[in-house]
């Protein structure tokens, strides 16, 4: 089917004038949901009077940050968890600063981490599939290493070009095995799968989340509150009026 070219929606002068008239008599203030500085800037441009809900878990779902969040979840001790949180702190601080800058002078309501931990992990079925694939890869690498001797059972005088080709393949596989990249990937996925089983809940919507999560792992909320306050302090130093609400 054909597609009609689209353009980004824009506020034209006439609409801005109409909305300004509405603002003069409005008794309600409309705020926005925004979880990133980009979304906050768009909301401000569209006339939002602040951010009514900033969901911090949306910041964690970024593909560059998710591995750090997963390290935090896999941590067995508070110290290990804090090490991962220290990596997240500057990222969260930068996010909040960008949001406060976009919403200068307006309130920003921040919700600390709410969803259960397992939402940041792959599903059990996905992990089981990936573990199976990695184990197949390991078996295949071992089989190729044994291939020359196996082929000699069929033909003790292997053709020279067979021997050379297999030698090159074996050399490549030897480097791969020495790097242990597959072993590390397998170990991580097995650890994630164990954690998925541990965190599994019958009804996650009413389970280990929100304030319950904060009571179990107070260091998570400590990091987030620190990031909010440090971002607010940096903005204040730059003359930006901020109204963070947690």
Where are these regions (language model features)?
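Conserved alpha/beta-domain cores
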Residues: 8-246
């Amino acid at each position: 089917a054909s597609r009609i070219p689209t353009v980004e929606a824009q506020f034209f002068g006439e609409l801005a004038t109409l909305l300004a008239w509405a603002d003069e008599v409005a008794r309600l203030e409309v705020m926005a949901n925004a979880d990133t500085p980009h979304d906050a800037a768009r909301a401000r441009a569209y006339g939002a009077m602040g951010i009514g809900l900033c969901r911090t878990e949306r910041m964690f779902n970024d593909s560059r940050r998710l591995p750090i969040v997963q390290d935090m979840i896999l941590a067995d001790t508070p110290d290990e968890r804090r090490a991962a949180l220290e990596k997240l702190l500057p990222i969260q601080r930068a996010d909040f600063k960008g949001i406060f800058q976009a919403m200068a002078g307006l309130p920003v309501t921040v919700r600390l981490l709410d969803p259960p931990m397992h939402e940041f992990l792959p599903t059990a079925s996905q992990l089981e599939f990936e573990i199976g694939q990695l184990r197949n890869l390991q078996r295949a690498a071992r089989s190729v290493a044994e291939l020359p001797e196996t082929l000699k059972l069929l033909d003790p005088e292997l053709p020279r070009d067979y021997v050379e080709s297999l030698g090159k393949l074996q050399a490549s596989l030897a480097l791969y095995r020495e790097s242990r990249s597959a072993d590390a990937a397998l170990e991580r996925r097995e650890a994630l799968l164990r954690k998925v089983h541990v965190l599994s809940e019958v009804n996650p919507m009413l389970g280990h989340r929100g304030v319950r999560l904060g009571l179990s792992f107070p260091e998570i909320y400590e990091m987030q509150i620190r990031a909010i306050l440090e971002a607010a302090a940096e903005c204040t130093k730059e003359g930006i009026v901020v109204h963070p609400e947690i």
